[in-house]
Design a protein with these regions (language model features):
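C-terminal interaction-tip segments
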Residues: 1-33, 37, 92-112
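Short solvent-exposed strand-capping/beta-turn motif centered on an Asx-Ser/Thr pair
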Residues: 40-45, 93
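A short, sequence-level motif marking secondary-structure junctions
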Residues: 67-71, 106-107
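Beta-sandwich interaction modules
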Residues: 71-85
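Cysteine-clustered segments with highest specificity for TGF-beta superfamily mature ligands
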Residues: 86-92
Length: 112
């Protein structure tokens, strides 16, 4: 699959420090945005299950659903296009501290 993006979109880094089992919004798309990178780091001494979901029109799609070992990181998709109103949510299986960082291209647009 070939994806062409509008290079005029602004990139931003979206950090989230999390230590609760409540689903937490990481990012809400305001237009045709794109996730260019996603990293989850477990800063605790015990493993934790991390779920990252794309929510579109009240339907959730798992992007990451994985146990992250103590003091390690995992990476998500290299490119994830989003529509206006799409939401990225993060949920932890236990209340251990986790850092999540996403790199977003705002207004990436689409072509094709």
């Amino acid at each position: 699959m070939t994806v062409l993006i509008n290079q005029t979109g602004a990139c931003t880094t979206v950090p989230l420090a999390l230590s609760t089992t409540t689903p937490t919004t990481l990012y809400t798309a305001t237009q045709f945005d794109a996730v260019l990178g996603l990293r989850v780091t477990n800063t605790h001494s015990s493993a934790v299950v991390v779920t990252v979901e794309l929510v579109r029109s009240a339907t959730s799609y798992a992007i990451i659903d994985q146990s992250v070992a103590a003091n390690t990181s995992i990476e998500g998709p290299d490119y994830l296009p989003m529509k206006e109103g799409d939401v990225l949510k993060v949920t932890l299986g236990s209340a251990n501290p986790v850092d999540v960082v996403a790199v977003i291209m705002q207004g990436a647009g689409r072509n094709g």
